[in-house]
Design a protein with these regions (language model features):
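Activation segment
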Residues: 12-15, 40, 80
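Short, acidic/polar
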Residues: 12-25
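Active-site beta-strand/loop signature of hydrolases that rely on acidic residues for catalysis
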Residues: 6-7, 23-41
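Structured beta-strand-rich core segments of catalytic domains in phosphoester-bond hydrolases
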Residues: 37, 44-85
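Extreme N-terminal starter segment of soluble prokaryotic enzymes
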Residues: 1-5
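Short histidine/acidic/glycine/proline-rich micro-motifs that form metal-
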Residues: 9-10, 85
């Protein structure tokens, strides 16, 4: 199993620099992105999708801050979007 973790310092800016082209070449089973700094509404377009992956986003409560996003080829057993859940 290949797992990739990456601090993107803004998923939208990283997408413009070729992040998703690179991710599709890496072919990791699980991709964990930190500091995505975007809401679900902001990353709905196809530019933020990866073929054969499901996406799970946990947004920061304050807009433009933090947030994590996971792309996975397999369905997770459980998804926790907050501590203690």
């Amino acid at each position: 199993m290949k797992v990739l973790t990456l601090n993107v310092c803004g998923i939208r800016a990283s997408q413009k620099k070729g992040l998703f082209k690179w991710l599709s070449k890496v072919k990791a089973d699980i991709i964990c992105l930190q500091e995505v700094r975007a809401s679900e509404e902001q990353i709905q377009s196809k530019e933020f999708m990866l073929s054969n992956y499901k996406r799970y986003l946990s947004e920061a409560s304050k807009k433009g801050y933090s947030g994590v996003c996971i792309y996975t080829k397999e369905d997770p057993i459980k998804i926790n979007k907050a501590f203690g859940s």
